[in-house]
Swiss-Prot record:
InterPro entries cross-referenced by the UniProt entry: DNA-dir_RNA_pol_insert (IPR011262), DNA-dir_RNA_pol_RpoA/D/Rpb3 (IPR011263), DNA-dir_RpoA (IPR011773), RBP11-like (IPR036603), RNAP_asu_C (IPR011260), RNApol_insert_sf (IPR036643)
Residue numbers spanned by region Alpha N-terminal domain (alpha-NTD): 1-231
Keywords: DNA-directed RNA polymerase, Nucleotidyltransferase, Transcription, Transferase
Domain description: The N-terminal domain is essential for RNAP assembly and basal transcription, whereas the C-terminal domain is involved in interaction with transcriptional regulators and with upstream promoter elements.
Organism: Azoarcus sp. (strain BH72)
The protein's name in its UniProt record: DNA-directed RNA polymerase subunit alpha
Protein's gene: rpoA
Source lineage: Bacteria, Pseudomonadati, Pseudomonadota, Betaproteobacteria, Rhodocyclales
Any single Gene Ontology cellular-component annotation: DNA-directed RNA polymerase complex
Enzyme's top EC category: transferase
Length: 326
């Protein structure tokens, strides 16, 4: 008997190419699942892994990013681009204020950044700037935690933080630099229509490539768990309210104690309830056989004593369940 159960990968091979590169191979998948899971993992790896990046910088003697600094080979734009290439990792906190102070001829690298024991510089040899004799570079760097790519103008800035010389940076928080996947044919026994998924990943060194894939898989599982526990949201059904009707209107016209002549004239026109009566106009009643002006005045006076008049409009009349008299 053929089983309808979906295959799950039984072979997972992790090949470490370098400290920042790895190739992960998984098989077998049912046909089509290689692309489904490969694309989902790739998008999560590129967009949803947390990381740290410089977000603001203040440089002594510099008012804006289009300035130059005496004694430094790079202009400020190039300096900021180099600064964005510094890979950092904060331990036990989500943001930090770092300092860099260097003077004299030489190369300024990420190693010159000072921030404390819980700030790890992943690429300390990364070049930030070159100073000439007599050159000096002093700056404060704010590092924050985030996800994906966040333009500087997308982050709200409070009024007290809008100071002259404060430069806001576009931040690329993702620790993953490159991800690609390939789906190949796989075979299990007599089945040859299966998928083999191969993922190549490169990080910036702040996270291990294998751990990055595990994290992305957990994110995907967490998001899909909502569908696994899918339940319809109960919608409260509010019963339709029947418009309330004055009980007086449900009483028969006999309760008005009209003269026999007037009462008989109304019943001849199928007017059995007070609610029927008040919806008629004077003109309509005067057309009733044997009902003259005297009877009309009598009806108007009796209705007025109960706060009612002729020609009134009633919605939902007659109400459901009203017994027909006659």
């Amino acid at each position: 008997m053929q089983s309808n159960a979906l295959l799950k990968p039984r072979i997972i091979d992790v090949q470490s190419i370098s400290p920042v590169q790895a190739r992960v191979t998984m098989e077998p998948f049912e046909r089509g699942f290689g692309h489904t899971l490969g694309n989902a993992l790739r998008r999560i790896l590129l967009s949803s892994l947390p990381g740290h990046a410089p977000t603001e910088v203040s440089i002594e003697g510099v008012l804006h990013e289009y300035s130059t600094l005496d004694g430094m080979r790079e202009d400020i734009v190039d300096l900021l681009l180099n600064l964005k290439g510094v890979v950092l990792k904060l331990h036990n906190r989500s943001e930090a204020m770092l300092t860099l102070s260097k003077s004299g001829e030489g190369v300024v690298t990420a190693r010159d950044i000072e921030g404390g024991h819980d700030v790890e510089i992943i690429n300390p040899d990364h070049v930030i700037a070159h100073l000439a004799p007599g050159g000096k570079l002093e700056m404060q760097i704010k590092v924050e935690q985030g996800r994906g790519y966040v333009p500087g103008n997308a982050r709200p800035v409070s009024a007290e933080n809008k100071t002259i010389g404060r430069i806001v940076l576009d931040a690329s928080f993702s620790p993953v630099r490159r991800v690609s996947y390939l789906v190949e044919s796989a075979r299990v026994e007599q089945r040859t229509d299966l998928d083999r998924l191969v993922i190549d990943i490169e990080t910036n060194g702040a996270v291990d490539p294998e751990e990055a894939i595990r994290y992305a898989a957990r994110v995907l599982m967490d998001q899909l768990s909502v569908f696994a526990d899918l339940e319809g949201t109960p919608v409260a059904v509010v019963p339709e309210k029947t418009p309330s009707i004055d009980p007086v209107l449900l009483r028969p016209v006999d309760d008005l104690e009209l003269t026999v002549r007037s009462a008989n004239c109304l019943k001849a026109e199928n007017i059995y309830y007070i609610g029927d009566l008040i919806q008629r106009t004077e003109t309509e009643l005067l057309k009733t056989p044997n009902l003259g002006r005297k009877s009309l005045n009598e009806i108007k006076e009796v209705l007025a004593s109960r706060g009612l008049t002729l020609g009134m409009k009633l919605e939902n009349w007659p109400p459901a369940g009203l017994e027909k008299l006659g």
